[in-house]
From Swiss-Prot:
Pfam families: GatB_N, GatB_Yqey. Heterotrimer of A, B and C subunits. Its EC number is 6.3.5.-. GO terms for molecular function: asparaginyl-tRNA synthase (glutamine-hydrolyzing) activity; ATP binding; glutaminyl-tRNA synthase (glutamine-hydrolyzing) activity. It is an enzyme of class 6 (ligase). This is Aspartyl/glutamyl-tRNA(Asn/Gln) amidotransferase subunit B. NCBIfam families: gatB (TIGR00133), PRK05477.1-2 (NF004012), PRK05477.1-4 (NF004014), PRK05477.1-5 (NF004015). InterPro entries: Asn/Gln-tRNA_amidoTrfase_suB/E, Asn/Gln-tRNA_Trfase_suB/E_cat, Asn/Gln_amidotransferase, Asn/Gln_tRNA_amidoTrase-B-like, GatB, GatB_C_1, GatB_Yqey_C_2, Gln-tRNA_amidoTrfase_suB_CS. It catalyses: L-glutamyl-tRNA(Gln) + L-glutamine + ATP + H2O = L-glutaminyl-tRNA(Gln) + L-glutamate + ADP + phosphate + H(+); L-aspartyl-tRNA(Asn) + L-glutamine + ATP + H2O = L-asparaginyl-tRNA(Asn) + L-glutamate + ADP + phosphate + 2 H(+). GO terms for biological process: glutaminyl-tRNAGln biosynthesis via transamidation; translation. Belongs to the GatB/GatE family. GatB subfamily. It comes from Nitrosomonas eutropha (strain DSM 101675 / C91 / Nm57).
Amino acid sequence: MQWETVIGLEIHVQLLTRSKIFSGASVAYGARPNSQACAVDIALPGVLPVLNRQVVEYAIRFGLAINATINSPSIFARKNYFYPDLPKGYQISQLAHPIVEGGHVTIRTGDKEKTIHLTRAHLEEDAGKSTHEGFHDKTGIDLNRAGTGLLEIVSEPEMRSSAEAVAYARVLHSLVRWIGICDGNMQEGSFRCDANVSVRPAGSDVLGTRCEIKNLNSFRFLERAIDYEVARQIDILESGGSIVQQTRLYDADRDETRTMRSKEDAHDYRYFPDPDLLPVVIPQEWIKQIREKLPELPEDRHNRYIRDFSLSAYDANILTAARELADYFEQTVKFLPEQIKLCANWIIGEVSGRLNKEGLEIDQCPVSPEQLAGLLLRITDGTVSGKIAKDVFDSMWQSNDNSADTIIDAKNLRQISDNSEIEKWVNEVLAANQQQVADYRAGKEKAFNSLVGQVMKMSRGKANPVQVNTLLKKHLIE
């Protein structure tokens, strides 16, 4: 039997505020356990929550970015369950009236585009953290994270493979960083994914029983966890068994999912409106002000790069993966507007490759857009070859005060374009390699590349490669 995978994601985005959603306690990462938990966070009797205006603005900003509806009023509800790191015995969340409803994003896998619709995005507080290591037969509770503001983003179950799920998660990860509401640090838990996975016979419209995989904090783990879970469910169904609805954890060391608890439904949490928090009424004028402050969004830039810069969808996709990278590209193009494709190639290749190798972000790049444009200008005007330019780029990276021209002159790297000098090297190479000359004339193209390499070696890489090719072919057909 052929099976179809059905995936929906719930993504928890930690909002980039300085204080918590309902208290003034700090949200700085890495503080001493329980040093950033105030009376509200630890649920002392008599204390009341006060909503942080900034988290509401961030939620509206996200909703506008995905063309969603901003609900007014929006209502907070109590989600009741017991867990040691949940001091109140309930979590303040949203159910019937989330702040953001609907919306969509576009994902790309290979050369295919697909629209993924969102169900909702709602505000809630994070729980604390249970620690089991270092406590013999006990559990340590750290409430520093309790009360941190989260935006939970829930998709429709429209993804059909782990690749689509990862593409969707990457789009949201890029978007929340792009609009400045989250730092996207997955290692610190700022962006966490829960995957709801089920399978059904191909062609069926009936959803299968789903299992939720909790707290996936890397795109690689998200992909591997989904692939394992799909295979597990298919194996059970083809063996005549049935899927039990449950919450599961992904064990990265063993590359498998395992049962955490039976999966609850909304009614199990006994939601009801929080009597300590008024409905949030959002004026249209405030929404308008937030909309006017939004930057050009990644999808709009992606389309503009294809339309105005004639870049491929692949190039545009990479360049708009992060706002800082797109800004770096556009600043480079401003200095070299006639060489847009060359700028794109170098930023995607040399610049991004070096950043990845050294674990740096684009805003830490020691070569500025102006310096990079200066180097690329020397390629286009024939001062240096592409190969030599890579050596110059390496020197610029190591000594960020140096311009391309300074390094080229200091190291005597200017390309030689004097026909008579290049012809002298060509004649010497041809005279010394009669067998390769004969091989080329007999139809062996590889012999030509060898001859080119020897001329470039003789010139210490400084001969103009276009002229070398032209002169070699001229002499070889004589």
